[in-house]
Amino acid sequence: MEETTKQNNMKKKKKILLHSDDSKKKERHIVTWSPEEDDILRKQISLQGTENWAIIASKFNDKSTRQCRRRWYTYLNSDFKRGGWSPEEDTLLCEAQRLFGNRWTEIAKVVSGRTDNAVKNRFTTLCKKRAKHEAMAKENRIACCVNSDNKRLLFPDGISTPLKAESESPLTKKMRRSHIPNLTEIKSYGDRSHIKVESTMNQQRRHPFSVVAHNATSSDGTEEQKQIGNVKESDGEDKSNQEVFLKKDDSKVTALMQQAELLSSLAQKVNADNTDQSMENAWKVLQDFLNKSKENDLFRYGIPDIDFQLDEFKDLVEDLRSSNEDSQSSWRQPDLHDSPASSEYSSGSGSGSTIMTHPSGDKTQQLMSDTQTTSHQQNGGELLQDNGIVSDATVEQVGLLSTGHDVLKNSNETVPIPGEEEFNSPVQVTPLFRSLAAGIPSPQFSESERNFLLKTLGVESPSPYPSANPSQPPPCKRVLLDSL
């Protein structure tokens, strides 16, 4: 029993001694220097120099040679540098460490102005920075790595977006790739400075502002393809899109603008004069336009259904008159003529006449040609300089009037139009001048309201026929009469 207790006590003593030794090793020994010791160190260095550190350390009781050397180079010597390191010093430090290893005293001799402790601390800092940059570069390489599980799409602006094949369906990937422009599909957009990117998505394109000539005769089909905007969809094959874009200096745009100015000036002239002679002069202007257009070979750009523009001109005159005069005195009472022996019916007003179709196509075509020849013979030699409405330059530039210019000479004439006429293709033309009555719906009246309105307007019997020009609606009064 006594032996066992002795052994246990011996073990406890050994543990206590080991613990005390470890605690002493873990304790940091801080060396302090007093001002008196610093003065002694300076005096000994001035006498012995910086080579005999053992003699200098013997003058102190608790200072070693290493401590004396560090105190001198780190704090007391003014020749050593303090502060940041330059790139040249970092390069020299790395080269010296590669040659001498971790012998910092030798490295400090190479790197002038730095102590061995400063050299060691700087090298440790450089190693930490290098490890940090290598870790960041490794992360960037992993992120930019392309593998089968994580695919990236590179956009033209340099942005890459990962797409996972497992989580997305083929339809989703197709939709996300549909808006990415293909570099081979980037074409020049005419003569403009920007480019046009043709997307692979199926979009409805609007036809350009162009004139469609149906009965124009040309030597080859290239000119018709330039005038007609024909957009074709490509099904995996290379098919060129045929589009027409009018430039600012195009003769067609100039002709359209001159035609608008012509109609406006004619309407103002007729409204200002307010006589039958001014109306006849206006029709002579239109006839002269046709002659000029045929001479200049600009008629091939004309629109076949241009007769609606003549009605629009008369509607414009009527609207100007109704805005300046009183409503009761400005509107002319229509003369209704309905002969049972003929199939022609006309209802004339101050703004124009209603044109009805004739059952026989050959006779009406002959009548139209006779009317045109007589009007050309009568008005071919007359000029417009006396009226001062439009100049010769304007007459030469405008070539967009059809044969419907000589439909009427005054508001009471009626000219039939063939009921059946064959065209190569349907005409789809945006009207150049829309009437304000286009957006007004036709009213519905009862029998008593209809009779009251007829008596108020001075009309004995209602018009049994609606308007014969469905493409362009007549003014408000004719809409009201036709609805009754």
Curated annotation (Swiss-Prot):
Expressed at low levels in all organs including roots, leaves, hypocotyls stems, flowers, siliques and buds. The keyword DNA-binding applies. It comes from the Eukaryota. PROSITE patterns: HTH_MYB (PS51294). One of its GO terms (molecular function) is sequence-specific DNA binding. The keyword Protease does not apply. Residues 463-476 have a biased composition (Pro residues). One of its GO terms (cellular component) is nucleus. Residues 232-241 have a biased composition (Basic and acidic residues). One of its GO terms (biological process) is positive regulation of lateral root development. Pfam families: Myb_DNA-bind_6. Residues 1-20, 215-241, 321-383, 458-484 are annotated as: Disordered. InterPro entries: Homeodomain-like_sf, Myb_dom, MYB_TF, SANT/Myb. PANTHER family: MYB PROTEIN-RELATED, TRANSCRIPTION FACTOR MYB88. Interacts with RBR1. This is Transcription factor MYB88.
